[in-house]
Amino acid sequence: MQISYFHVPAEMPQSVRPSAAVVIDVLRATTTIAWALHNGAEAIQAFADVDALHTAAAAWPADARLLVGERGGQKLEGFDLGNSPVTVGPETVAGKRLFMSTTNGTRALDRVRDVPLLMTAALPNREAVAQRLHQHKPDTLAIVGSGWEGSYSLEDSLAAGALVHRLLELDSAANAAANDEATAALALWKQWMHDPEACLRTATHGQRLIRIGNHDADFQCCAGLDQLSTVPTQGEPGVLKAA
C-alpha cells in the first residue's frame, strides 16, 4: 500500500487517482459524522455549497431530516444543529438523514468524491478505518486533511499520523510505503499520542473554539481514541453511511 497524506485538499494533484481515500476533519466534521452514524443516523449527505444543501433537503421528508451546518465554528442560522459530536445523540439523529455543510470537512469530501472507496476518519474510529483498509488492501491510499480555510491544521495531521501508525502495524514495512507528509504526521502522532486532547487544544482551530465558547465536551469527544466501530463510507456521491 502506497500511503500519501495531503494536508489540505488543494495539495492533492488532479492527476492523483488513488484506489481509496480517507478524509479527516478532527475538529469537528468527521468526528461528528462518525458519532452520528454510530447513533443511528440513516446517512450523512455532505455539501460544500449551502444552497445545494437546501435544495436537496427540501426533497426529503421534514420529519426524517436534519440540517447540520457550521461556518467559522458557529452553527448556521436556520439549521437544526451545528458541527458538534456531542449534539448528535441517538434521541436526536436516529433514523434521520443529516444534510451537512461545514467550513472545511465537507469541502474536502467534495474533492475526492469520485474515488472508488471513500471513507472518513477521526480519532474515535481510527482503528475501525485502519481495519477496513487492511481488509480491502488498496494499492494507493490518499489521506486528505481538511485544514482550516485552505491552511494546514495540526489536529488533522495528528489523526492522519494515528491512522498511518496503525496501518504500518497491520502491514509490514515491506508492504507499505508513506510519503514525507505521512511520515511527518506519524512523528507528530508519536509526540502527542499519550495526550491527544492537549494537541487539539494547542492547535490553532482548537484555540479558536476555546475563544468562542466552552467546548470541553467537544474536545473530549474528538480526542477519544478507538471508541467506535463505525466506518462512514460513501455509497453514492456525497452520501456517507455506516459500514
Curated annotation (Swiss-Prot):
The keyword Magnesium applies. It catalyses: (2R)-O-phospho-3-sulfolactate + H2O = (2R)-3-sulfolactate + phosphate. Keywords: Hydrolase, Magnesium. One of its GO terms (molecular function) is sulfopyruvate decarboxylase activity. It comes from the Bacteria. Its cofactor is Mg(2+). It holds the Pfam family 2-ph_phosp. Belongs to the ComB family. This is Probable 2-phosphosulfolactate phosphatase.
